[in-house]
């Protein structure tokens, strides 16, 4: 019994030296994190940004030697075309193997090449290792990534962004008719110039403005508005003299005969404003420049006596190419830089804009004549002045107005 207890107590003590002397398997040190690798670089406002990653690096496929042979799984070597191989190099594996001692006597400070994980359909792993080793010997440095450039087209110093009708970056919310054609249909630089385009301000011939009588006849109507909503129009003297009395209040109403207008330049030259650019007037209410003292004049005449029954007013809107016929391109905008009307283009004024009316608050119901004159004072030379006036028959009932018989008249 005593012997059994002695064996149980002394047995573990005798095994301790044996366990200490036994060779222990060395543990591999923990893998150090791989080096950061630059993958993406871009430039913004003069600052260079880089995106670094620890992920695997994609190796593009290399061109193989056509005389190389691939070994089949059965051991026979035969010449056959090889398919591309996708290579991935892992930074963590490279750093771990570099610190592992070499069993074949290789110098410890000499790192092994990075491990590559590959996939190729139709080949065995042994043949893949041979191909990977050959590619490692002939592998060249990967090309540098191309420098990023600004994707926005270069702007011209002598051109304003708001004045280029072909600029797709132009802010055009204030005018829905601006840039309504495809902005990328820019004429080619080496092609023949279209009529009225690319000839600058020095052209042969003269402009010829012609108002559209049918456009006026189709959309003439009567509207009542309060003086509160006519404050901008009152600043530009678009109302009758009775609207400027001292006893007029904001909730008083005015009766307006509204009508649209569309003027075409059917001449061979640009219609440019009569005033120089430095003398254009800025109107803060309507947020545009007036480049002419009087572009149009509106009058309401008695049908029998041809006398003026409603006080007309001057309409000195800004000039621009609202739309053009097929084959012509817009070149002028309603800005402080360029204003005008190109040949083959139209300057359109809708009936619902300010000052596109005649104040008929003091006019009695009856038959009248609406007279719309374009370039009435002949401030800009034209090739023909006999087609600058439109006359329409107006029947006013006190609440409604009916337009008919609109034609072009020489007077």
Curated annotation (Swiss-Prot):
<dbReference type="InterPro" id="IPR001695">
    <property type="entry name" value="Lysyl_oxidase"/>
</dbReference>
<feature type="compositionally biased region" description="Polar residues">
    <location>
        <begin position="93"/>
        <end position="103"/>
    </location>
</feature>
<dbReference type="GO" id="GO:0055001">
    <property type="term" value="P:muscle cell development"/>
</dbReference>
<dbReference type="GO" id="GO:0007507">
    <property type="term" value="P:heart development"/>
</dbReference>
<keyword id="KW-1015">Disulfide bond</keyword>
<dbReference type="GO" id="GO:0001649">
    <property type="term" value="P:osteoblast differentiation"/>
</dbReference>
<dbReference type="GO" id="GO:0030199">
    <property type="term" value="P:collagen fibril organization"/>
</dbReference>
<dbReference type="GO" id="GO:1990869">
    <property type="term" value="P:cellular response to chemokine"/>
</dbReference>
<feature type="site" description="Cleavage; by ADAMTS2 and ADAMTS14">
    <location>
        <begin position="212"/>
        <end position="213"/>
    </location>
</feature>
<feature type="modified residue" description="Sulfotyrosine">
    <location>
        <position position="181"/>
    </location>
</feature>
<keyword id="KW-0801">TPQ</keyword>
<comment type="subunit">
    <text>Interacts with MFAP4.</text>
</comment>
<feature type="binding site">
    <location>
        <position position="286"/>
    </location>
    <ligand>
        <name>Cu cation</name>
    </ligand>
</feature>
<dbReference type="GO" id="GO:0016202">
    <property type="term" value="P:regulation of striated muscle tissue development"/>
</dbReference>
<dbReference type="GO" id="GO:0071897">
    <property type="term" value="P:DNA biosynthetic process"/>
</dbReference>
<feature type="propeptide" description="Removed by BMP1">
    <location>
        <begin position="22"/>
        <end position="162"/>
    </location>
</feature>
<dbReference type="GO" id="GO:0046716">
    <property type="term" value="P:muscle cell cellular homeostasis"/>
</dbReference>
<dbReference type="GO" id="GO:0048251">
    <property type="term" value="P:elastic fiber assembly"/>
</dbReference>
<dbReference type="GO" id="GO:0005581">
    <property type="term" value="C:collagen trimer"/>
</dbReference>
<dbReference type="InterPro" id="IPR050912">
    <property type="entry name" value="LOX-like_protein"/>
</dbReference>
<dbReference type="GO" id="GO:0035791">
    <property type="term" value="P:platelet-derived growth factor receptor-beta signaling pathway"/>
</dbReference>
<feature type="signal peptide">
    <location>
        <begin position="1"/>
        <end position="21"/>
    </location>
</feature>
<keyword id="KW-0186">Copper</keyword>
<dbReference type="GO" id="GO:0004720">
    <property type="term" value="F:protein-lysine 6-oxidase activity"/>
</dbReference>
<dbReference type="GO" id="GO:0045652">
    <property type="term" value="P:regulation of megakaryocyte differentiation"/>
</dbReference>
<dbReference type="GO" id="GO:1903010">
    <property type="term" value="P:regulation of bone development"/>
</dbReference>
<protein>
    <recommendedName>
        <fullName>Protein-lysine 6-oxidase</fullName>
        <ecNumber>1.4.3.13</ecNumber>
    </recommendedName>
</protein>
<dbReference type="GO" id="GO:0048514">
    <property type="term" value="P:blood vessel morphogenesis"/>
</dbReference>
<feature type="disulfide bond">
    <location>
        <begin position="345"/>
        <end position="355"/>
    </location>
</feature>
<keyword id="KW-0886">LTQ</keyword>
<keyword id="KW-0964">Secreted</keyword>
<dbReference type="GO" id="GO:0051898">
    <property type="term" value="P:negative regulation of phosphatidylinositol 3-kinase/protein kinase B signal transduction"/>
</dbReference>
<keyword id="KW-0479">Metal-binding</keyword>
<feature type="region of interest" description="Disordered">
    <location>
        <begin position="58"/>
        <end position="163"/>
    </location>
</feature>
<feature type="cross-link" description="Lysine tyrosylquinone (Lys-Tyr)">
    <location>
        <begin position="314"/>
        <end position="349"/>
    </location>
</feature>
<feature type="disulfide bond">
    <location>
        <begin position="318"/>
        <end position="324"/>
    </location>
</feature>
<dbReference type="GO" id="GO:0005615">
    <property type="term" value="C:extracellular space"/>
</dbReference>
<feature type="disulfide bond">
    <location>
        <begin position="392"/>
        <end position="406"/>
    </location>
</feature>
<comment type="function">
    <text>Responsible for the post-translational oxidative deamination of peptidyl lysine residues in precursors to fibrous collagen and elastin. Regulator of Ras expression. May play a role in tumor suppression. Plays a role in the aortic wall architecture.</text>
</comment>
<keyword id="KW-0732">Signal</keyword>
<dbReference type="GO" id="GO:0042981">
    <property type="term" value="P:regulation of apoptotic process"/>
</dbReference>
<feature type="region of interest" description="Lysyl-oxidase like">
    <location>
        <begin position="207"/>
        <end position="411"/>
    </location>
</feature>
